[in-house]
Design a protein with these regions (language model features):
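Hydrophobic packing and interface segments
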Residues: 1-742
């Protein structure tokens, strides 16, 4: 078994290595220069005119400025939130209501400190990731200008390396900061005697990360879709001009939104997932006297899983950039699949020796589940491969390389209504396999090691986070690069939801561990009522976010139409026409997102606090289970429906859909056709589903659970967990079925 120093060295070395590797990838991207008048090596392509180089630089600068301005405004509000909510955490988590002590200010202060550190770390990771993405967008465009296979190789490598900067930087930063926080808190709460208090305080770190992710996902999602939907409606549908046309005043805001929502928001989301899964595992591990007795090597097992994933992801990165290279469009999906499969396989092989290296030969969780290192490996492995399967299934239902999306595209032949009907059906159907996979992971983890096994399965889902995040960020960078190319007149989300579901369940395990409940009676009236209320919350949340996008999009359409009407020659594209006012559109998106993200945020944050305060811990248990079971289904169906509509539109734009004319000849239906307009309507409806409401439901599931975990002792201290209304914890016959939590 490893010594404490060996475990420390492995975690720290992985974190430092990950940051250095992220720096190396950024250095590779920075070799491509984007300058005016083609001064840089990047603009030496023979067909690039000087005015095009200038235009490229201007667009890149405008996107960079807009992204920085939005994030500054959003993070100013987030910083104020950290201060205010941190004070609330300090007071409420200090309240213990014991005969000999009313407040434990040490516990409250440490929890609030962990919360602030988690929030600030998430903000730093999101900001750096977004700025790297903005930095890389134009460079990806430039790389794609090269002819033939060279253009594909260099553009793919540029975007993939930029995604890697985000993936390795975020994962390593989360790991290092959490480890430093644990060792700092140990001075107040020694592991051997105060392990429970130590990791309950550390749980604030996950709460901080997830709180910022809420504002990043909701605010960023509203920003990007207000601009995107507004640009599409005013441009392609109303005025019949192409997507990302430089005449459209909303295009810069649209491209800023790709970075704000799809990069910064997603990065904060997955940062929160990693922090929460790790914190939940640490809290639940205190139920095993053998793990605590074995010391830091066994306790740090969840951190070492993440550390191992950093090394594995780094090794597999070179497969995509140097071994299976992208030489044509058809190679992209294959290379990304190889990347996912190879990293998952290598990670699976390495978890076995890691488990035997760190964990005791036998240990018991909650006095019930007898575990061994190989059983712990099974839990991690089912999460690893579950994430892989969910990713592939999501691709099947959202890529136009496969039948489901092509079927949706063909449905556009009879109009937008059938397109929407087919898309909704696809989204609902796409939830079947992911939910089955998640259920299997939960069953294997729970039956093997109780809630500790479920938490390990969640960590398995996130085991190769650096690789998964690199691939996720690759998409928005390429999307943005394509938008820049079209504006410069050059030639023309499943994993996160699956991990969020398992993380939420792991946090639920941490919550019931903290409130020291051995069973939750699902037929207890208060628990059953809480379950129904929890199942309703994702729908309420979706209604809020969808309407917010609609309100902001209407403002954007009116502004774009005003500019087309008042700026001479803009719509017609006449020589010497006045420039569109991009700043006005950026301001509309910024103001709308900051204004509209507050009500959904309050709904998520206050729901468990109010429920626990007034109705007690069993009502909270029902609330969390209800929100999880309905939220994960809704998130998958919304995200995949929107993704299918998006790719059905792209399939039509590629000229892959044809209809017969009166003479029986096939006529290609590309851009500008009636079929294309129907596809655009579906894509526009799906935009807020796949980029705002669907992804933000991840945060709803996780944030409600981590809030309940952090405030668990406070809820328990109010009338013994019965709440201010003093509701009995169990008022049903003894024969009623119960859900074991240990």
């Amino acid at each position: 078994m490893a010594s404490p120093m060996e475990a420390y060295a492995f975690v720290v070395s992985a974190g430092v290595f990950g940051l250095l590797f992220a720096s190396f990838l950024f250095w590779e991207v920075s070799k491509i220069k984007v300058t005016r008048r083609g001064d840089g090596y990047s603009l030496l392509a023979a067909d690039v005119r000087h005015h095009t180089a200038d235009r490229l630089f201007e667009i890149y600068s405008a996107i960079q400025e807009g992204a920085r301005a939005f994030l500054l405004a959003e993070y100013t509000l987030c910083f104020a939130f950290i201060i205010v909510f941190g004070a609330i955490i300090t007071v409420l988590t200090s309240y213990v209501n014991k005969p000999d002590q009313t407040f434990d200010w040490t516990a409250g202060a440490l929890t609030a400190t962990a919360f602030a550190v988690g929030g600030l770390t998430s903000m730093v990771a999101g900001y750096l990731g977004m700025m790297v993405a903005v930095y890389s967008n134009a460079r990806t465009t430039v790389s794609a200008m090269k002819e033939g296979a060279r253009g594909w190789i260099e553009s793919f490598n540029t975007a993939f390396r930029a995604g890697g900067v985000m993936g390795f930087g975020l994962t390593s930063l989360a790991l290092l900061v959490l480890f430093i926080l644990i060792k700092a808190f140990e001075t107040q709460y020694p592991l051997a005697t105060h392990s429970k208090q130590l990791f309950e305080a550390i749980a604030g770190y996950g709460l901080g990360g997830s709180s910022i992710a809420l504002f990043g996902r909701v605010g960023g999602g509203i920003y990007t879709k207000a601009a995107d939907v507004g640009a599409d409606l005013a441009g392609k549908v109303v005025e019949n001009i192409p997507e990302d046309d430089p005449r459209n005043p909303a295009t810069i805001a649209d491209n800023v939104g790709d970075n704000v929502g799809d990069v910064a928001g997603m990065g904060s989301d997955l940062f929160g997932s990693l922090a929460e899964a790790t914190c939940a595992t640490l809290v639940i591990s205190t139920q095993s006297t053998e793990i605590i007795a074995a010391g830091w090597p066994a306790v740090l097992f969840p951190l070492v899983i993440t550390a191992t994933g950093i090394f594995v992801s780094a090794a597999c990165t070179f497969l995509a950039t140097h071994v299976w290279v992208v030489k044509a469009e058809k190679d992209v999906e294959t290379v990304l699949k190889v990347q996912i499969f190879s990293s998952t396989a290598l990670m699976t092989a390495l978890v076995v020796p890691v488990a035997y290296w760190l964990l005791p030969a036998e240990f018991v969780i909650a006095g019930v589940y007898h575990c061994t290192p190989i059983r712990a490996f099974y839990c991690v492995a089912v999460g690893l491969w579950g994430g892989c399967v969910v990713g592939f299934v999501t691709e099947y239902f959202t890529s136009h390389s496969y039948h489901p999306v092509r079927e949706v595209a063909q449905a556009c032949e009879t109009g937008a209504a059938t397109n929407i009907i087919y898309g909704l059906a696809l989204g609902y159907k796409s939830a079947i396999v992911p939910i089955t996979v998640i259920s299997i992971a939960v069953y294997v983890g729970f039956s093997t090691a109780g809630m500790y096994g479920v938490a390990l399965a969640a960590l398995g889902f996130l085991g190769t986070l650096a690789t998964s995040l690199a691939i996720d960020v690759y998409g928005p960078i390429c999307d943005n690069a394509g938008g820049i190319a079209e504006m410069a007149e050059l030639p023309a989300e499943g994993f996160a939801i699956g991990s969020a579901a398992l993380v939420s369940l792991a946090l639920f395990g941490g919550f019931v561990t903290r409130i020291e409940e051995t069973t939750i009676n699902i037929l207890s009236p208060i628990t059953f009522a809480g379950l129904f209320m929890g199942a309703m919350l994702p729908y309420w949340f979706t209604a809020m976010t969808m309407k917010s996008v609609g309100v902001a999009a209407m403002e954007m359409v009116k502004e774009v139409k005003r500019q087309f009407a008042t700026i001479p020659g803009l719509l017609e594209g006449l020589p010497g026409h006045g420039p569109p006012d991009h700043a006005k559109c950026i301001k509309i998106s910024t103001d709308a997102s900051l204004r509209e993200m507050i009500p959904p945020g309050l709904l998520v944050i206050l729901s468990p606090i109010i429920t626990g305060t007034f109705f007690g811990v069993h009502a909270v248990s029902g609330l969390l289970v209800g929100a999880l079971t309905s939220g994960v289904q809704l998130a998958i169906s919304q995200s995949n429906t929107g993704g299918a509509w998006d790719n059905a539109k792209k399939y039509v734009e590629k000229g892959c859909v044809s209809i017969e004319d009166k003479e029986g000849k096939l006529i290609v239906q590309g851009k500008g056709s009636a079929i294309h307009k129907a596809a655009v309507i579906g894509d526009t409806v799906g935009d807020p589903l796949k980029d705002t409401s669907g992804p933000a439901l991840n945060i709803l599931m996780k944030l409600m659970a981590i809030i309940s975990l952090v405030f668990g002792d406070f809820f328990k201290s109010i009338n013994g967990g019965r709440g201010l209304l003093n509701i009995p914890l169990d008022t049903v016959a003894a024969a009623a079925p119960v859900v074991p939590t240990h």
